[in-house]
Amino acid sequence: MKIILLGAPGAGKGTQAQFITNKFGIPQISTGDMLRAAIKAGSELGQKAKILMDMGQLVPDDLIISLVKERVAQEDCEKGFLLDGFPRTIPQADALKSVGISIDYVLEFDVPDEVIVERMSGRRVHPASGRTYHIVYNPPKVEDKDDITGEDLILRADDKPETVLDRLKIYHNTTKLLVDYYQAEAAQGNTKYFRLDGTQKVEEVSQELDKILS
């Protein structure tokens, strides 16, 4: 069971990725984690990536693809894997295909931009503990104060409406093209494509995923 999740930041991919990995016993593979692990292990690919990152350069697709290929060949990926944050572009998706990594399910979480802005800009964080609240869905007992310590909660820079809108713009300009790409792949029988309504309750989305993947 090899899965890719698509959807804008704040569409609920992280929550459902956890559900899928726990339910089906497959690892979630994040390119960021993979890069850090390869650098820590001092592998040849890791050393190459470190040189580029130390110079402030982006790690090229061919190196990332080599890392993905190496990672999915490991024992814990025998039953499958869930790719997190990759591919982001059509050349990356093509490269995955060219090295023989096939994808069984592409799952898109569809949430309107205004809902995402409301979701993300309503988040409040207690910096010391990482506890997270939401002014609408999970408010603290006292406005803008942490329930346990009474300390101030903050709105992270990443969650400010203008930042969220910028990130959504990037998503629509780049990653959204993958939606068309994988729908075309599904039409040719190369994968299965499902679009889920990400505005539903978390449990409802999880139930839908369970039906699709079981």
Curated annotation (Swiss-Prot):
GO BP annotations listed: AMP salvage
Location of the region described as NMP in the Swiss-Prot/TrEMBL record: 30-59
Subcellular location: Cytoplasm
Chief subcellular location: cytoplasm
Pfam families: ADK (PF00406), ADK_lid (PF05191)
Residues annotated as binding AMP: T31, R36, Q57, L58, V59, G85, F86, P87, R88, Q92, R156, R167
Top-level taxonomic group: Bacteria
Annotated positions binding ATP: G10, A11, G12, K13, G14, T15, R123, T132, Y133, Q200
Protein role: Catalyzes the reversible transfer of the terminal phosphate group between ATP and AMP. Plays an important role in cellular energy homeostasis and in adenine nucleotide metabolism.
Quaternary structure annotation from Swiss-Prot or TrEMBL: Monomer.
Name of the protein: Adenylate kinase
